[in-house]
Amino acid sequence: MILKSFILGNLVSLCMKIINSAVVVGLYYGFLTTFSIGPSYLFLLRARVMEEGTEKEVSATTGFITGQLMMFISIYYVPLHLALVRPHTITVLVLPYLLFHFFWNNHKNFFDYGYTTRNSMRNLSIQCLFLNNLIVQFLNLFILPSSTLSRLVNISLFRCNNKMLFVTSSFVGWLIGHILFMKLVGLVLVCIRQNLATRSNRLLHSNMYLVSEFRNWTARIFSTLLFITCMYYLGVHRVKLPILTNRLKKTSEIAEQKKSKEETDEEIEKTFETKETKKEQQEFTDKVHSLYFEEQEDPIEEQGYPYKRNETKEKRLGKEKTKDEFHKNIPKYETLDLDRNQEKKLELTILKQKTNLVWFEKPLVTLLFDVKRWDRPLRHIKNSRFENTIKQEMAQYFFHTCTSDGKQKISFTYPPSLSTFFEMMQRKISLCTIEKQSPENMYNHWLYTNEQKRHNLSNEFLNRIEILDKGSSALDVLEQKNRLSNDENKQECLPKMYDPFLSGPSRGRIKKGYSTRRIMNDSSASTKGKKVWINKIHGIFPIDYVQLEHKIDTFLDESLSGESGTSFPGESAPLKGLSLSTDKKRIDSENQEKSLKFLFDVVTTNPNTQTRDKESILIREIHKRVPQWSYKLIRDLEEEEKETEEEPKQVFGIRLRKGKRVVIYTDTNDKTNTDTSTSTPSNPAEEIALIRYSHQPDFRRNLIKGSIRSQRRKTVVWELFQTNLHSPLFLDRIDKTFSFDIYRIMDLFFRSWMWKEPELKTSKSESEVEEKEEKVKKQKEKKDENERIAIAEAWDTFIVTQAVRGLMLVTQSIFRKYIVLPSLIIVKNIGRMLLFQFPEWSEDFKDWKREMHVKCTYNGVQLSETEFPKHWLTDGIQIKILFPFCLKPWHESKLRSHHITHEHEMDAMKKKGKEQNFCFLTVWGMEAELPFGYARKRPSFFEPIFKELTKKIQKVKKICFLVLRTFKEGAKGLVKVLKEKASWVIKIVLFIKKKIKELAKIFFFGFGLREVEVEVYESNENGKDSITNNNIINELPIRIRSVNWTNDSLTEKKIKDLADRTTTIQNEIERIKKEKKILFMTPDKNVSPNKLSCNDKRSESQKFFWQISKRKGARLIRKWHYFFKSFIERIYIGIFLCTIYIPKINAKLFLESKKNLQKFFDKSIYNNETNPDGIDETNKNAVHFISTLKKALFNISDKNSSISCDLSYLSQAYVFYKLSQTQVINKYDLRYVFQYQGAHSFLKDRIKDYLQTRGIFHSESRQNPFRNSEINDWKNWLRGHYQYNLSQTRWSRLVPQQWKNRVNQRHRIQKKDSQKWHSYEQDQLIHYKTKKNYAVHSLPMQKEKLKKHYRYDLLSHKYLNFEDRNNSYIYGSPLQVNGDREITYNYKTHKSKSFCTLGGLTISDYLKEEYLIDTDKNSDRKYFDLGIIYFSLRKNIDIKAWIDKNIGTNTNININKKIKTGNTFYQISDKKNLFDLTISQQRNSSNQKTKKTKKFGFLDWMGMNKQMLDHSISNFEPSWFLPEFCLLYDAYKVKPWIMPTKLLLLNLDTNENIRNQNENIRKSNKINGNKKQDFRISSNPKDYLELDNGTPKEKEKQGKVKGNLGSNQKTRENLGLDLRNQQKNVENDYVGSDIKKRRKKKQFNNNKETELDSILTNYLVFQLRWNPFLNKGIMKNIKVDCLLLRLINPKEIAIDSIQSGEMHLDLMSIQRDPSLTKLIKDGIFVIEPRRLSIKRDGQFIKYQTIGISLVHKRKYQTNRGYPENKYIDENDFYGSISQHGKMFVNGDENHYDLIVPENILSTRRRRELRIRNCLNSGNTENRNPVFFDSTNVRNCGKFLDEDKYLDTDIQKLIKFKLFLWPNFRLEDLACINRYWFDTNNGSRFSMLRIHMYPRFIVS
């Protein structure tokens, strides 16, 4: 078996090697190349079809194979590839060849020498045939299927090592495929010939002329096909024939047309300080050209300058360029030394000769191929700011090889400028000086270098620590930041913007200069300043130009001046002399000192904006060459702008999108002549115009006019006018049936005759009908609008259509106004006179004169009756008819307005009582309500007449109906009388019948005859016949009929018919009875025929009961199935209900118990780690199925009551017994319980053994050491620190944002009445329920996203938190120090503490000025429901009344209650107790030892600290406009979600009420100056604030309130929240500081100015949004105003516009300076909150990040107090102290922050030390023993004076905070995917490479 497998394995490996070998792969790809058929195959087929002989077939095949072989060789051999594949060569090759081939086929005898005895291979025709096949193969043209197959060999060549073998095998593979193909073609030709020979043999023999003609035509067909194919490929892919297109003038040619005198004078003034001779200019220009154009990769033209690049480009452009023209735009360098460039003179002479070449002296290739020529089908990308035609920025991906970690790697984010610079340096340096190192040597060198640097850095760090141990000052040990200074004595450094040792945002930004176009335009004027070229170094420090004017030559190098320069379009006086000196002497040492001093002189700048004020700088940087256009192309709009300029207008340019210029306003001072229709003012008027673009796709936009369009690939165009391109993949889904849609065209152009069809109405409920109508209405409006847009653009399809339409409209207008309407008036009045009516000439002509035909633009903007729009024949025109004339039969009738066609519009107009007295004229003379809309129905002239006739007819009908009604009533009375008479007659007849019957009986009895059956038919009153039946006694019955008293009467006939029918039915009944009677009657004969015997009676009763039972049985049988089914169902339902009811009760109890048990087991299970065993996260909650505890565990009396989480009374045995009984328990979840550190201490041994036997608990899990000791170090480090005191708003910006928002939106506070709080020790574990709440109800994709986010968040959270002995943390841990603070746990929906807002958090996290979040964040980050907070904020006292000292109480405090404000835990709650707030009150230390201590302001939340009289931000007293804004401004600006927007406008009142209220507040709030109050709460518990009627009882400084409303500076200086007390760097970054500076300068004289300024300056944070519904109305007003401005008497039209609703007066009533209150009340402005964003640099982030917080534990503290901050501005070390960073004891100057030793180093060195230690992490032997040896841990006790300052609980000092990275890199800690190591590849962001240091031990 082993031998067989070995042999089999060898065979497989051998086969794989053969398959992957170069020979097989080459054969395969070469064979595939055969299937790419091109024009070259036409010659092979031609040679075989023509049957010209074997020699020609052989020569054709040989030429074909030779050409293909050369093409294969050209893939490998570069010179041959350049010769055959380049378009230049192919074009030069094809054009003469096509001419020769055409001449060959038409003059064949010219080359035919006849048949001779020489070798036939020497025949010229055979040789030419060989050349034909060879040359056509060179063309490399392909027809079917594409050229991709032929390029497979080229692509695969890069993957093969043995390239020559691959090329050879590819050719062999192609040859095999070619032979097979030709054999197949030969077989097909043989079959065709045989069939043709048998059928047309006679015809061919009889007429030999046809055979020769057939051969000639075959040759011509092949030649034609070849010619067409070649021309197609040449036209599309190769060359654009210059004969077919025009030429553009280049930039230089345009410049030539300017006046030479003006140009030369300006150029000389611009560049030279003194005039020089022509010879000097020539020498200077020659030298500059040789230097400036030495490097082709750095063209100056890319910056937009008009001069050309180099001699190579001049040759390529192929334009004649004289010497003066070429040199006129070159920058003039006076300082360049000609002596250094003597070797360049030969090149200069050659260059001058080349630049003076005429067109016929240039190469042919340059004439035919110009890659920069304008008619190439390329997009013209142009930078609007500069003259450049393409942007110079490169893509973010730039690939280049770089050295990373000692290895050569490809980087995709390599700096392009560095790559370009490297290439330039390679050309400068000789190749022999560059040595290539092996990869191993490079890597070893990198390791050695890194180790040395790490060793040096570590030693430096240790040395600094040792110096500290010896007692040196901390300031001497701390690493100083290097700054550049210009004076040793003054210790003044350069500003951050100019300090080269700094980097980042502190350097500021340099504004981009003017556009080059403006620079060129301004250069013509001498007053605009002088154009200066200096070095890039001088661009950084441009100050002392005059002192160094002649001594700057050292700083100018050839390459530097040629490759980087700066242009200063300055206007200052010192720039006038800034031409660089021509002094050729070296600067001595004395001058060098001066020049170095010059470098430190600073340009005066504005420190606020950090921008240079005097001049803008354009610094040319090293960059990659970008292809540009060498022609100055302008767009259509630029052509229109340049019509009035003197420079010549460009004929060609760039096509824009299809659009029209719409003039919206024309400012004219001269009056126009209204007599002529197209009058123009004498002076050109200023117009304000917009561009209206077409909605149709435009393929021609941004293409150059006249250029040949490129043939798009993979697109199909099959329509004559196709708006969209389609891919062939989707053609099967498009209806491509070709049909001339005449109906669609008629619908577009003739729709003005087509009226809208009436809509069908259906009866439904009112709500459904209204909803449907509204939906249909919107769809209809949208559809109509789209149709109108389509029609408008259909008229723009051709140029002529607008002119035709405009002329038709004008013709229709004249025809209607002056022909149709007057004719109708005449006909009408003549008709009235013929009908003997009075004519109405005056009324009709009055209405006719009232009709106005206003000319409008194409968009409907009204002009006037006589003024036509500009270019209306090309742009289009609309004619609007005001007060359209309607012919009426008489004027007394009140006709309904006919101008409303749509029903919904009709209803709306009826409600408003308005009418639309206008319409638009269509091209067919109809009326439309909107341009290009449907034609509306005009009211009929005869409709009122018909209405009147209808009314009269209705009156006549009414009279006739009355007569008929009277007649009917009389007829009814007559009928009634007749009926009574008839009934009386019937009674008499019945009586007579009865008497006759009696007489008949007497008569027959008297004669002794036997009794016979007598049947008397009587008609009773009910209409039924009573029948007397007697037995038949062997005799026929005698039917006696009653006497016919009333013959032929209707009643008698009915009676007769009824009797006959009844008789028939009775006979049938009797027959059936007789048949049934046989079964029950006995055979005895009846003795008496008139009486029944006993048997008969018995049989009758039996028959009766049998019939009943039979009938009931039949019915029972029929319904038995349904009865049985119903019975079974009832039984089932009863059983099912009984079965469901009991489990329902049990399930209800189980769910309640499960809900209460959830908290207990979540506390026990440490599920902060991801599931390592592959178990789905959604199954984690299986452990919660504890189904049998029910009510025995918890007494749940009320579902909404607060649930206690203290389950300590449950025994362990009972809990684990129930756990073991659970069927679906996930034992992996329980693993975390037993691996938890504290689990072993409380679990009993018996329980452990029992669980171990059950497989739940394993013995090895007791002591489960971590595999990686480095992870142990990490956890040990983490275990020694507190949680970070980050606000949740700040942390929310560091974790995935959207996921966090979704979590917050899902969880809402539900238990509003509960005040139960649990201690930190009991509920440190805040469980994470989003797994259950999310994963169960989400889609699979959301599950995966949630898991991914969870993993990232968990990793980040573990990174920032730790595990200690008492508590274990999961994801939802709160991100603040929670010492003894209590946290909320009173929600139904369990939710993470970090997502809870304001509960158990310091309010300082929300109300600091620095916590302004960015504006680009989503506005859906609402941490709680805004609807639950409603404050009554009319007075400050209301807020004070909410402060409740006692936790959990629901009582309100009295106003006069005293509140002690020491270190007290406050709760702020509204009356409904909807949420709780914790206020961290800070102590005010009265013993301040240093002046450097920063004043930390007391927290001001919504004005709770009462200081409203002089607020820190508003700077106004509360007696101003909208005092509610003043009250809520700080808190709402900082965090808009603290309160809803509705509160801002609660007390919005009129200005009078506001001013009255302000006066009252002003009187009550007098300032008392006897006591200087610091409003920060004192640490003295005796100090308190007493509330009395909303004002503090402390005496305040009295003073008069002046007009500037709150300019009391002293009180403002003492406020804790004053921005001026903040640190200087923070103040510069804060937006409000600039606002406050501006506010100080303003003085106001009245309240109105105060209100306006306060809104514009202070309250821009509230965004005023324009109401979108007003846009339509304002546009209508503008259109009407355009007409009214042109009218002499606009009164009538204005009134009508107001009545019809076109003009809105409420919009016109807006004043120029309205009050904000009125605008908001009118609905014009809508207030929206807007969050501010701040620019944050490294300094600001340092103050915002986490600091070191070592807090004392006092017995009387209920929350943590924060002592004062310490800041020392001299050193960067104190920047690491955060806003919350606190010292151990107040007022201490010792720097105890040195407990973190790494703060000795600077932030950059800190990071370097850590990174270098991490790079060698795999080698444990080389680790620094200081950090990795536990026996050598440093003792930090020497840093602290324990006896004096330390707290007794020394172990708390271990819990300090230490970052892995510097403090300002906090955002990198949470962003896992960010590049942390400053490398250009993203290979080092793995958490596995990060290693921690062990914590420092405090002795």
From Swiss-Prot:
Bias kind Basic and acidic residues: ranges: 269-280
Residue ranges, annotated region (Disordered): 256-280, 1581-1619
Membrane topology (UniProt): Multi-pass membrane protein
GO biological process assignments: protein transport
One GO cellular component, as annotated: chloroplast inner membrane
Transmembrane spans: 23-43, 64-84, 87-107, 124-144, 172-192, 217-237
Swiss-Prot/TrEMBL keywords: Chloroplast, Membrane, Plastid, Plastid inner membrane, Protein transport, Transmembrane, Transmembrane helix, Transport
Keyword Membrane: yes
Localization in the cell: Plastid, Chloroplast inner membrane
Signal peptide coordinates: none
Entry function: Involved in protein precursor import into chloroplasts. May be part of an intermediate translocation complex acting as a protein-conducting channel at the inner envelope.
PANTHER family: PROTEIN TIC 214, PROTEIN TIC 214-RELATED
Family label: Belongs to the TIC214 family.
Record's subunit section: Part of the Tic complex.
Protein name per its UniProtKB record: Protein TIC 214
Originating organism: Ceratophyllum demersum
